[in-house]
Amino acid sequence: MAKRVKRAGRKREKKHVERGIAHIHSTFNNTIVTITDPAGNTIAWASAGTVGFKGSRKSTPFAAQMAAESAAKAAMDHGMRTVDVYVKGPGAGREAAIRALQAAGLEVSLIKDVTPIPHNGCRPPKRRRV
């Protein structure tokens, strides 16, 4: 049987970034929080799924809160203190994620809604009949 060779994977170096941007992508099914440096390089990210929620529980505000908390802790390990928050999407976890970032100890200096709005683009999905 072939032996497994352990490759020395390079350890991710800690970037020391004081100021960053928190991108909150909130859909009807999930919330993804990505924290980047001002140049756009990802420092930390988390989603409702990576925090441990499955199925319809991912779309709850509490799941968004936990995802934002997890991403904020990882970003603060890199020395981050202040963030600008860009929110995209119509989901339930928008406000909860912003509050969680503040509660985790990050100072929120700006909140901006960057939800893309079509100028009569694609046809929307048909209405649900339950």
Swiss-Prot record:
GO BP annotations listed: translation
- Classify the source by domain of life: Bacteria
Spell out the subunit comment: Part of the 30S ribosomal subunit. Interacts with proteins S7 and S18. Binds to IF-3.
Gene Ontology CC entries for this record: ribonucleoprotein complex; ribosome
Keywords from UniProt, A to Z, are:
Ribonucleoprotein, Ribosomal protein, RNA-binding, rRNA-binding
For this chain, one GO molecular function annotation is: structural constituent of ribosome
Q: What is this protein called?
A: Small ribosomal subunit protein uS11
NCBIfam families cross-referenced by the UniProt entry: PRK05309.1, uS11_bact
The family note in this entry says: Belongs to the universal ribosomal protein uS11 family.
According to its UniProt entry, the function of this protein is described as:
Located on the platform of the 30S subunit, it bridges several disparate RNA helices of the 16S rRNA. Forms part of the Shine-Dalgarno cleft in the 70S ribosome.
Q: Name one Pfam family in it.
A: Ribosomal_S11
Check the record and name the PANTHER family matching this protein.
40S RIBOSOMAL PROTEIN S14/30S RIBOSOMAL PROTEIN S11
Q: Which organism is it from?
A: Caldanaerobacter subterraneus subsp. tengcongensis (strain DSM 15242 / JCM 11007 / NBRC 100824 / MB4)
